[in-house]
Amino acid sequence: MAVNVYSTSVTSDNLSRHDMLAWINESLQLNLTKIEQLCSGAAYCQFMDMLFPGSIALKKVKFQAKLEHEYIQNFKILQAGFKRMGVDKIIPVDKLVKGKFQDNFEFVQWFKKFFDANYDGKEYDPVAARQGQETAMAPSLVAPALNKPKKPLSSSSAAPQRPITTHRTTATPKAGPGVVRKNPGVGNGDDEAAELMQQVNVLKLTVEDLEKERDFYFGKLRNIELICQENEGENNPVLQRIVDILYATDEGFVIPDEGGPQEEQEEY
């Protein structure tokens, strides 16, 4: 039977998005580039097969799933495995299959803790177990779109912007600065244009992911700020310490005077 894990709080042990993808890809020998690709449920099914051999009907798992009803079927297989091994976790299938970053990132954070609590270190050949199948490309990778951030960030947004550098190595391996220069004597303008367009699309996806991650962490910081404001009259030293951390700035940082330029314009 499985060891249940109930903690869902954010701790220093939580992996970043980049580290989480690296762990999944290394453990299962996959090539996932986005947390959202976990919405198919296939990776979780194989992790369960790794932890508890025979708990999952792995042959029924659709690693090439591209449609929502296929994702749901995979999660049903996962739920059956959870029930068989006595795992109490309720899987939010309706949210996960929508492919939203926040929902999938929160669930995989829990699953990583569950995995660590149950993994015994035994050898496992993931490619042979799934008979060489690879996961399907996420639908959003086919027609990428560059979205602008939905909310302006205040001075407290400095903290959530720090994870920005974590995504640079998650681009698809096909794109690279040296791709266009391969076989210069043979290639033509159309091929080079196609390669450049592919690189642009990858960069757009990277920016989109970074904006989602920034907004995700900003939302958490904003919720913490609201809780502190609601209880600021209690003179709680812990709350005050949290507020100090929220509003702390890097050494030497100066908040710009937004009124300065307007006043100068009025004088002229």
From Swiss-Prot:
Residues 185-268 are annotated as: Interaction with CDK5RAP2. Residues 14-116 form the Calponin-homology (CH) domain. Acetylation at Lys-220 by KAT2B/PCAF promotes dynamic kinetochore-microtubule interactions in early mitosis. Crotonylated by KAT5 during mitosis, promoting astral microtubule plasticity and dynamic connection between astral microtubules and the cortex during mitotic chromosome segregation, thereby ensuring accurate spindle positioning in mitosis. Decrotonylated by HDAC3. Gene3D superfamilies: 1.20.5.1430, Calponin-like domain. The modification N6-crotonyllysine is found at K66. Residues 163-172 have a biased composition (Polar residues). The modification Phosphotyrosine is found at Y124. Residues 232-255 are annotated as: Interaction with SKA1. The modification N6-acetyllysine is found at K220. Residues 147-160 have a biased composition (Low complexity). Homodimer. Heterodimer with MAPRE3. Interacts with DCTN1, DCTN2, TERF1 and dynein intermediate chain. Interaction with DIAPH1 and DIAPH2. Interacts (via C-terminal residues 206-211) with APC (via C-terminal residues 2674-2845); the interaction inhibits association with and bundling of F-actin. Interacts with CLASP2, DST, KIF2C and STIM1; probably required for their targeting to the growing microtubule plus ends. Interacts with MTUS2; interaction is direct and probably targets MTUS2 to microtubules. This is Microtubule-associated protein RP/EB family member 1. The modification Phosphoserine is found at S155. Plus-end tracking protein (+TIP) that binds to the plus-end of microtubules and regulates the dynamics of the microtubule cytoskeleton. Recruits other +TIP proteins to microtubules by binding to a conserved Ser-X-Leu-Pro (SXLP) motif in their polypeptide chains. Promotes cytoplasmic microtubule nucleation and elongation. Involved in mitotic spindle positioning by stabilizing microtubules and promoting dynamic connection between astral microtubules and the cortex during mitotic chromosome segregation.
